[in-house]
Amino acid sequence: IMRDGRLMPLDIRYIDPLAAYFNRIMARHRRKMPEIEFGMAEYLSAFYPSHDISLVVIQNALDHSANPMKSIYESIDVLKKGGCLYLNHHINEAETEHYKGFHQYNICREDGKLIIWNKNERHDVAELTAGFAELTVGLTENGHVAAVIRKTADVPQSLIDDKGDKRALCSLFMENARTASSPWHGLKNSAA
């Protein structure tokens, strides 16, 4: 609601890398929900380049991402100054799930700090975003880690530069193409 009592128009978007699958499931079960758009938090500024978003919500998804810190940087980047990134996640889900499937990162609160970690790396989110964001972190009633990150300045371009990502994606694509073109590719999973 605006100060003069009028309702402010909202443009709410739902994004997920698996949008096509979720949309099919919702259609199959005749769910009346907004359609989910394809998008990846690690590349959010490619989908929303205008830097005028007020709120980004990431719920139970950072632990699934390929690069949680890049997801945070990109999410802050698309926000207007003063905009907020809200995070809500199960505590240390990768440990709970034994690093199986999508669960490759843990998210927790330690000594009042938001920490993202796995067996190979550990990140203090407030420390890594100190020059362009303010962070508060707590626990919800259901025991999830919740954080609000408010954008205070522009994200340094070096943190959202995607040239290295493009190289890695091209290498991954070429490796998959080599594997797929192997005459043995179809046999690997067919023997049971």
Predicted regions and their residues:
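Short conserved AdoMet
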Residues: 7, 66, 80, 130
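A short glycine-rich, Lys/Arg-flanked "PGG" loop and its adjoining helix->strand segment in the class I
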Residues: 69-84
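Short alpha-helix
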Residues: 105-137
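A short SAM/SAH-binding and catalytic strip from SAM-dependent methyltransferases
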Residues: 54-67
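Conserved class I S-adenosyl-L-methionine
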Residues: 84-113
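Core SAM-dependent methyltransferase catalytic element
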Residues: 125-192
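A short acidic, Gly/Pro-enriched loop at the edge of an enzyme's catalytic core
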Residues: 39-56
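Class I SAM-dependent methyltransferase SAM/SAH-binding core
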Residues: 1-44
